[in-house]
Amino acid sequence: RVWVSGALPPFAAAVRERVRSLGGRLDESQSPQDAALCIVTPLGEDASACAAREKLDPSRTVAIDVLLGLDKRRTLMTTPLTSPAMREAAHGLFSSDGVPVSVIRDSAGCVVQRVLAHIVNIGCDIAQQGIATPADIDRAVTLGLGYPKGPLALGDALGAHTVLTIL
């Protein structure tokens, strides 16, 4: 059984839908039943902090990064106490459709979240200092680095609240 935290409703809905589509059995209760795999969806925090805040058993808790969706790659984050059986259950479930899954150790937020938020932050700082216009910054990054979006366009897509929460 898989219990998904509802702390971030849009992320929780995406994970619940993915668990269903992968054939996982959802635990729909308010708090996880004994022995259920607990999935949290952190935004700017680690799996341990999520487990502590939500009073979850850290040995059954695994975080999944859903900031950029779940279609191309999935990143799971374990707590220092996550049992190998729960880690393997989460990996097995989320990789069952062939999408690559990476498992990382507990860290201060998910790697992709931190990198993207800092790129946005640096772009905003350059614009705020008047070094370049927002349009020029975005153009330079897309042309010079080959990024699909510039830092300010990325910030607009993610939303200021999301970026600030991650930072």
Spans of model-derived segments:
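Hydrophobic beta-strand segments of well-ordered beta-sheets in folded domains
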Residues: 1-3, 34-41, 59-62, 71-76
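Short, well-ordered secondary-structure micro-motifs within conserved domains or adaptor modules
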Residues: 25-54, 74-75
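Interdomain hinge/lid region at the active-site interface
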Residues: 146-167
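Short, charged N-terminal beta->alpha structural module
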Residues: 2-27
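General structural feature for long, well-ordered alpha-helical segments within catalytic domains
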Residues: 11-15, 86-90, 119, 162, ...
